[in-house]
Each structure stands twice: as structure tokens, then as C-alpha cells.
Amino acid sequence: MAIQIPRGTQDILPGDVETWQWIEQKAYDLCRRYNYQEIRVPMFEHTELFLRGVGDTTDIVQKEMYTFEDRGGRSLTLRPEGTASVTRAYVSNKLYGQANQPTKLFYIGPMFRYERPQSGRMRQFVQFGVEALGSADPAIDAEVLALVMRFYEELGLKNLKLVINSLGDTDSRLAHREALVNHFKPRIHEFCNDCQDRLEKNPLRILDCKKDRDHELMGTAPSIHDYLSTESKAYFEKVQSYLTALNIPFVVDATLVRGLDYYNHTAFEVMVDGEGFGAITTLCGGGRYNGLVEEIGGPETPGIGFALSIERAIMALEAQQAKPAHNQAIDCYVVTLGEAAKDKGVELVYQLRNAGISAEKDYLDRKMKGQLKAADRLHAKWTVILGEDELAVGKVNVKNMETGEQTDVALTDLVSHMKQQVEGGNES
């Protein structure tokens, strides 16, 4: 019996990898323009990092983490998200002491959560995220929002909606927390077990419950906006004014609550509207997390960031029929006829590749017709035909596969000739 792929994972095959590389390159190029530098962190961390950084009352920590003990008895966890690891690296490597501040970082890599696999949710998934650490300026909130919206726009996605909210500062959240407890407590027995546990630990998370979202108390729950301090209101208004100045449309939703404990002030999601995308509409989430760095042992440091799923971006592209067509073409295919020509073909392909030209040859002893079909399947721009007769006179036949035009070229000149064709785009 063949061994099957683990549930909740996927093989990304060569034809699909090109789309992934295209999306990832968009992220790299955009982050370079915004002056964000790539950081690469371990795929597993000490479990304590996520207990403190993500929050021990969150679904991620309570239900979804892949946690194990190593042979030394240490509790380790495959990273379920990127922000905690990046902030840990920020503290461990004392990036807060560098001259260039704020520290602006981005990452692309796999995350792991034990979830029920469904459309848009995998147990191993790839996130692109950015983190800006060291600035409490509303302008950098706007920058992060501008970056993620531009990312989706450059992918070609339409019908995007940016939803924002303010979760306030510490005083605002404490006042709102008390109001939520008073609101839900008399009838908390009508809610799910998770919500009952959250009442005292983190009542804000009740508003994020999927099971009880239609309960009548949800619609009448106290709004955080009624408890925002003067400073929090001013901060949120400034973020909105920047977005307006940048011509970035947004919607304020006072019920927006992110599923992680570390968020405060600005919280946001990017959603996509339109048919064909199923029940999954949220593409990206993020927000400000002042206090997270201190929670994991660093100095007082404000921060803001987002994370998005590459898989969901691809789903959205497919739903909108905006997924780009990729036909990876090679520059030339070397066709050989006869043993001596075959041996020489090995040398020619090696020389062409070393000169920066993508080249391929036959390894299945196919006849000329089969080799030409292989060249066509690989979208070869040129074929280089070498038989016993050509070898005897020291020449090859170079054929432009688009125009059909053929030219005889000396073997000793082949590499320079092909470089001229490839780099100059000339037809041969």
C-alpha cells in the first residue's frame, strides 16, 4: 500500500510552483520598495513563546498547536504564526539597539496548525507577513495597510475590502472588558463552553465566537468605541485620515476582533467580495501589538504587522479567474542523432548552461521526431540539431521554433551565437 500524504497538507507540483514563485516575488519586490528586510526564523520554538506571545486563552494555543517534547525533555512547538517568532528574534538578537529604527521586517514561510482541513484552511500553510517594530506613529499603521492593499492589487485581485477597528489602549480595553462581563454574565450559560471559559479570561474573544455569533446578546454587546480613551480616539482618527489621504478605501467595523491576545489600537482585515470563493472571505489579518515585545522579555517596544495566507491568495485569484498563465520556456533544446553526436551534445548543453542559457537535451534515446516533440512541450525557443553529418563538418543547425527559420552555425561559435540570440531577442 502506497504511503499517503498527511491530512491537511499538499504537494505543490512544478506546474503550480510557478504561481507560488510569482506571488512570492511580488512580495519580495514590494517589501524592497517599502524598505522591509527579510528575516528567517526557526520552524519550531519553545512552547512558552506561544503561550506568552499568542495567549494561552486563544484557540491556537488551546486546540491547534503541534507540540512535542524533544529527547532532552524540552517542550517545543511548530510555529503556528509568525509574529511571536519574529518578535522573539528581535529581542534575542537585540535588533532594538540598531541605528536604523524602526525595524521593518518581512517573512515568507510555512506555519502549522491542527485544524479541520477545509477550503482555505490547511494544517501546513504558507504565510507572508510584515512586522514594523519600534514606532508608535499612526503613519506606520497606514504604511502597513497600504503595503498589504498594494500587494493584492499588484496580484490583480478586485473587489477588495479593508475593514479596520480600534481595540484601544490598556485603559480603554479594561473598561470595555468590564462592560462585556456585565453584559454577558447573566446569560453566559446560553453560550458555548469556549465562551463560558472566555468570560473571565478574555471576554473580548466572545465577540469572535463562530458558534454563538447569532445570539441576540452579540448584537447588543457594548462597543469598544464607547470606551476608547481620548488618546485612543485621536490615534484611530489619525490612522483614518492617513488612509483617506492615500485614497485607500476602508470600512470601520466596531465588532472586528482579531483571534490573538496581543492586539491593541489598530486591528484590521482584508476581505474579498464576489461569487466563487465559497465561505472564506478573509484574506489577511493584522494589527498593532504594543506590549508584545515586553511580554516575551524585551524592552518596551510598539509594533504593528499583518500575516496573509498564500493559499487563500491563490484561491482568490482562481475564483476571479485572474491567475496568471505560466509557460516556462527554455532557451534551446539540443537534438542529437548518433552516438558521437550524443556525446558532443552533453558538452554543448553544459557549455550553454554555463553561459547563462537554459538548455535541455534528450536522455531517453528518442529519435529526432520524439526529441522535437519534447522541445515543443518545453516551449523551447530554439532547437540546436547535431547529427553525424553536422559533426563531421563542425557545424550545428539552429532553428527558431517560432518562425521556422534555420541557420548553420559553427560548433565553436554556438555559445556566442546563442547568447546573442537570447540576450538580443533576435530571430535566427
UniProtKB/Swiss-Prot annotation:
Record family assignment: Belongs to the class-II aminoacyl-tRNA synthetase family.
Pfam entry (one): tRNA-synt_His
Gene it is expressed from: hisS
Any one GO molecular function term: transferase activity
Annotated catalysed reactions: tRNA(His) + L-histidine + ATP = L-histidyl-tRNA(His) + AMP + diphosphate + H(+)
Subunit organization: Homodimer.
InterPro entries: aa-tRNA-synth_II, aa-tRNA-synth_II/BPL/LPL, Anticodon-bd, Anticodon-bd_dom_sf, His-tRNA-ligase, HisRS-like_core, HisRS/HisZ, HisRS_anticodon
Intracellular or extracellular location(s): Cytoplasm
GO cellular component: cytoplasm
GO annotation terms (biological process): histidyl-tRNA aminoacylation
Keyword tags: Aminoacyl-tRNA synthetase, ATP-binding, Cytoplasm, Ligase, Nucleotide-binding, Protein biosynthesis
Protein name from the UniProt record: Histidine--tRNA ligase
Signal peptide feature range: none
EC id: 6.1.1.21
